[in-house]
Amino acid sequence: IGDGTYNHSGLMSIRAAVSSQTSITYKILFNDAVAMTGGQGHDGDIEALDIVKELQAIGVSKVVGIYDEKEDLPLSQFNTVIDIYPRDQLIEIQNELAKIEGVTALVYIQTCAAEKRRRRKRGTFLDPDKRIFINPEVCEGCGDCGIQSNCVAILPKETSLGRKRQIDQSSCNKDFSCVDGFCPSFVSIEGAVLKKTLPGELIVPFIESPQIPAIKNTFNLVITGVGGTGIVTIGALLAMAAHLEGKGVGVMEMAGLAQKGGAVHIHCRIASRPAEISAIRVAFEEANSLIGGDLMVTAGEKTLSLLKRNRTKVVCAQNEANAGEFTLDRDFTLPTDRMRLAISSKVGSKNVALITGEEKII
C-alpha cells in the first residue's frame, strides 16, 4: 500500500491482521506524495520513520526498510530502530520476511519520480549533474537495460542494423538503474543540459470565424491523451471559453499526479444555458466530437464506446508514443494500423482526421 493509503485507512487493516495473528507481509511504499489526487503532502506531515515506529508500536513482529541510495535519509536514525538496506536487496529481503510467522512489514522509501521533477524545477530536490546516453553503434538491442530499470524512458530506435535502444531525455528521471544492465553501450556525460528551443515566430494565416450552429441539448466533447502532455489544460481552456461566452459547461478531469504517463480522458459538455447540463460524464455513444492527443488511448475500448457512427467527428494525432509494455517485451511494437482501423470503423472514415504533430525536445 502507498503511504497516503496507509495514513488514512491502511493502518487499520494492519492492526486487524496483528489482532487476528495472521501471517502476512505488508509492503508500504513511502513515495512522499498522495499521488492519486495530485501529489499533496500527507496529513500530519507523516515521515517514513514515523510509519516504522507506528508499525512497531501496534505489534508488527518485524519491520525492515528498503531505500533508494539517492534519497537524503537520516540513516543513523533508522539504524537505531530497524535494519535498512539498499533497494537492490528488495527481493532477497521480502523473501526472508515471507518466511516469518505473524505480521511483518517492508517500508520502501523512494520519492515519487513525478514529484522529483517538480521539486527539481523548484530547486528543492537534488538534481544530479549527469545524463546517460546509449551509443547505438555498440547497443545490440538485448533489452537488459529495460529489464533492470523497468523504465519507460528507454525507447526503441529502429536502425538498418535492427532495433536498438535510446533514452528519452525529456522523460528520464535520472534514476540511472538502466546502467545496471549487462551492456557496454552506456555513456555518462556530466554537465550536460537539455537544449532549450528558441521561441519561433508563429505565423497564423487569416481564418474566417466559422458559423457555429446552435447547440441542441448539449454538445458532448471528449479529449484523450497521455497524462502530462496538456490534455487536462485543453479541457480547462475550452470549458472556460464556453463559460466566458455565457454558455453552460461541465467538465470532468483526471488530474491526479498518478495519471502522468497514463491514459487520460476529459469529458466536456457544453449547452446554451447552465440549467441544461444535467450530467458531466459523456454516456455511451453520445460524443459529438473527440480530440485525440494519442492514438493508443483514442483507440482503446473505453474511448470507442463513447463514439457513434455518423455522429462523432474525430481529430487525432497519429504519432507513435512508446507504451509501458515495451519495458517487459523488447520486441513490442504498437499495432498502429489496427488502431487507425478501429477508430475509422467505429465512426466512418469520412468522420476521422488523423494528423501528425512534430516536437523538438533536445
Annotate each language-model stretch with its function:
Residues I1-S20, I24-K27, I51, I134-C151, ...:
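Extended, hydrophobic alpha-helical segments in both membrane/secreted and soluble proteins
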Residues A33-E47, P74-I82, T124-E137, T159-S170, ...:
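Short beta-alpha connecting loops at secondary-structure transitions
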